[in-house]
Structure formats: structure tokens, C-alpha cells
UniProtKB/Swiss-Prot annotation:
Reactions it catalyzes: a lipid A disaccharide + ATP = a lipid IVA + ADP + H(+)
Protein source organism: Yersinia enterocolitica serotype O:8 / biotype 1B (strain NCTC 13174 / 8081)
Keyword Methyltransferase attributed: no
GO cellular component, one term: plasma membrane
Primary role: Transfers the gamma-phosphate of ATP to the 4'-position of a tetraacyldisaccharide 1-phosphate intermediate (termed DS-1-P) to form tetraacyldisaccharide 1,4'-bis-phosphate (lipid IVA).
Pfam families reported in the protein's UniProt record: LpxK
Positions with a binding annotation for ATP: 55-62
EC category: transferase
Protein name, UniProt field: Tetraacyldisaccharide 4'-kinase
Length: 328
């Protein structure tokens, strides 16, 4: 229902407009208070790159963070990542991730980023505390913040916004009548825009999510996803239909598709009930990080990589490298 309202296909958004106006007014006041210096923002001693979005729901932000970390590391830079840790709850903040950190402590996205990139990752509701914790324990050239475009208490040197190229901005209204955290005009003040799927507008960098081989959660075995038989698909991400569409593009027609809420916790009994007999359960990598401890032999996940046009990717990386206060 909420997707229908946000897409502009339902008139019910009209009932939510008063709350949207209130949301918009509050977010504007917060931003202007930092712009005018009425509230102070903390500046890190190294460049901070924000990877965020203007809308709620999955836009492909985490694959961009992973891509950016990997690209900068390949060029010799030391990179750390901070996040609010949404979906996790730690006894102590800031929390520096380790191999034993669980998604219930740090959230699924930070754990995924940590496992994929091996970069130092810290989470805290106050992102500046996470940055300080990273810098205390690591010598870093860049800090990348996963989300946080609207977290103005942390000064930033580069703002990168990720857009869902198919859904774009829906009906254009602020939450809750629409999907917007900030209005589309905010794009005029950011440094780069990456468009995930669909058709990129002028000045935007197009991106596609390319699927890797499917990986077995128990054995680590890899195989082309198309070779899996009797597939049941599940996704607990911001926009599950994107994952199911990816499977369709690969020629996979799941017997069933299960969409779960973003950041949802799972149990063995819950996921085991989704398949029967010879069926294989195929999930996103973000789901997999929450299921490894009780994974079954017929469970697989499908990693995806962000792919950008080489020329535009190089231009983006050169702009970011120019911020570095070190030479490599």
C-alpha cells in the first residue's frame, strides 16, 4: 500500500499531507540552523564522503559504498566507514566492528560492508563519535559514511546521492505522504548523483547492479545462479522487487517470492518453512549476513556489484582523490 501511495497511484497521500508539511518544515529548520551557524557541526581531520539518498527505501546505496571503498583501496588509500547502525543495538557506542560482531549489534549493512571490504567500520547514532573511534584506532585517508546525508552535525567534504532510476522521487512529497527525506531540489547542492537502473538524467552517473555467482551459505560453494534448480526467492531489503527483477533478468523464475521488511530479523524455523523437498532458498547478500549462524545446506545468496561507466567512474574518483590530504 505504501509503495502505491508514494508512487502517486493513490489519492490517500492527500490525507498525509499535513504530516508531510510538518516533516518538511522540521528538516528545513534543522538544515538551515547548521547553514547559519546556529548549531555547530563537527569537522573530521580527514575528508568525509557522504553516500546518501533523498528518499526512503532501497536505492542501492550500500553497493555504492562497497564499490567506493574497493576503488579507493585499490588506489592505495586507507578508508574507513561509519554508519548509524540501523537495525542493530549495541550495549556500547561507538562500536568498532570485528569478526565476531553480529547484525543484532551493528545492523546488517555495516556487517555486510565490513565482510565484503575488510575496511574498518564503526557504528554510532552520533556519527561523529563513530568517526573519532575509527581515527583513534586507524590511520585513515578517507571516511565514508553510509547514509547520513541529512545528518548535518557531521561536516562533509563530498556529497554523493544515490537515486533509484526506476522509481525516482515517486509523488515528490516529504514523508509520510511521499518517499522524500528532502525535496529533489537538494540535488543542486550535492557533488555527484548516481542513478541505479532506469535512465539517468543529464549530469547523473548511470549505475547497474551486476550479479555474481550464487554462494552457498554453509559450504561457500559458488555456481552460476541459473544452475540452481527449484528456486524460492526471498528479500528483506528496502525494495525487494529489485532483487526479484534481477533474478528474472538472469533467467531465473522462482517458484515463490517472499518479500520481508528491511532490516528484519530471521529465525531458522521461519526461513526453513519457505522451502520444501528439493527447493533451494536464494536470498540477497544483505539477508545472508543475518542467517549464517543457522544456515541450511540449501540456502544460497546472490552478491551484486555496482558497475559504473569507466570514464564517469574515473572522473568521480579523481574528484574524491583531490580531497585527500596525503599523497600515495
Amino acid at each position: 500500500m505504501i509503495e502505491r501511495i508514494w508512487s502517486g497511484k493513490s489519492w490517500l497521500y492527500l490525507l498525509l499531507l499535513p504530516l508531510s508539511w510538518l516533516y518538511g518544515a522540521i528538516t528545513w529548520l534543522i538544515r538551515i540552523s547548521y547553514t547559519l551557524g546556529l548549531r555547530s557541526a563537527w569537522r573530521a581531520p580527514v575528508p568525509v564522503i557522504i553516500v546518501g539518498n533523498l528518499t526512503a527505501g532501497g536505492n542501492g546505496k550500500t553497493p555504492v559504498v562497497i564499490w567506493l571503498v574497493e576503488q579507493l583501496k585499490q588506489r592505495g588509500y586507507r578508508v574507513g566507514v561509519v554508519s548509524r547502525g540501523y537495525g542493530g543495538k549495541s550495549d556500547v557506542y561507538p562500536l568498532l566492528l570485528s569478526n565476531s560482531t553480529t547484525t543484532s549489534q551493528a545492523g546488517d549493512e555495516p556487517v555486510l560492508i565490513y565482510q565484503r571490504t575488510a575496511a574498518p567500520v564503526a557504528v554510532s547514532p552520533k556519527r561523529s563519535d563513530a568517526v573519532k573511534a575509527l581515527l583513534k584506532s586507524h590511520d585513515l585517508d578517507f571516511i565514508i559514511t553510509d547514509d547520513g546525508l541529512q545528518h548535518y552535525a557531521l561536516q562533509r567534504d563530498f556529497e554523493l546521492v544515490v537515486i533509484d532510476g526506476v522509481r525516482r522521487f515517486g509523488n515528490g512529497w516529504w514523508l509520510p505522504a511521499g518517499p522524500m527525506r528532502e525535496r529533489a531540489g537538494r540535488l543542486r547542492s550535492v557533488d555527484a548523483v548516481i542513478t541505479n537502473g532506469g535512465i539517468a538524467a543529464t549530469g547523473e552517473i548511470p549505475m547497474q547492479l551486476a550479479a555474481r555467482e550464487a554462494v552457498n551459505l554453509v559450504t561457500g560453494e559458488r555456481c552460476p545462479a541459473q544452475q540452481l534448480q527449484h528456486v524460492v526467492a526471498m528479500a528483506g531489503i528496502g525494495h525487494p522487487p529489485r532483487f526479484f527483477a534481477t533474478l528474472n533478468l538472469l533467467g531465473i523464475a522462482p517458484k515463490k517470492e517472499y518479500a520481508f521488511a528491511d532490516h528484519q530479523d530471521y529465525s531458522l524455523a521461519q526461513l526453513s518453512s519457505l522451502t520444501s523437498g528439493p527447493q533451494n532458498l536464494l536470498m540477497t547478500e544483505k539477508d545472508a549476513v543475518k542467517c549464517r549462524v543457522f544456515a541450511q545446506p540449501n540456502w544460497w545468496y546472490l552478491p551484486v556489484d555496482a558497475q559504473l561507466p569507466p570514464d564517469q567512474a574515473e572522473q568521480l574518483l579523481l574528484k574524491i582523490q583531490a580531497l585527500s590530504r596525503c599523497s600515495t
